[in-house]
From Swiss-Prot:
It comes from Lychas mucronatus. Gene3D superfamilies: Knottin, scorpion toxin-like. Has the structural arrangement of an alpha-helix connected to antiparallel beta-sheets by disulfide bonds (CS-alpha/beta). GO terms for cellular component: extracellular region. This is Potassium channel toxin alpha-KTx 27.2. InterPro entries: Scorpion_toxin-like_sf.
């Protein structure tokens, strides 16, 4: 029973990821071709937990307006 609660809490923690559309991604993003520090993710990419969602062969980072 304790294992089931632990598994439930782990799934819950992963499912509460903060998703922001076209938000700044600071904090050492290494999944993009160029880091998205002080830049924004281009649409339709999203910023999930400080990282832009990235696809192979696409530049997802844009210069931030602030």
């Amino acid at each position: 029973m304790k294992l089931m609660w632990l598994l439930f809490l782990c799934v819950l923690a992963f499912s509460i990821a903060q998703i922001y559309i076209n938000d700044t991604c600071a904090g050492g993003v290494h999944r993009c071709y160029e880091p998205c520090e002080k830049k924004k993710c281009r649409l339709p990419h999203k910023c999930i937990n400080g990282r832009c969602t990235c696809y192979v062969g696409r530049n997802v980072c844009a210069i931030s307006s602030h």
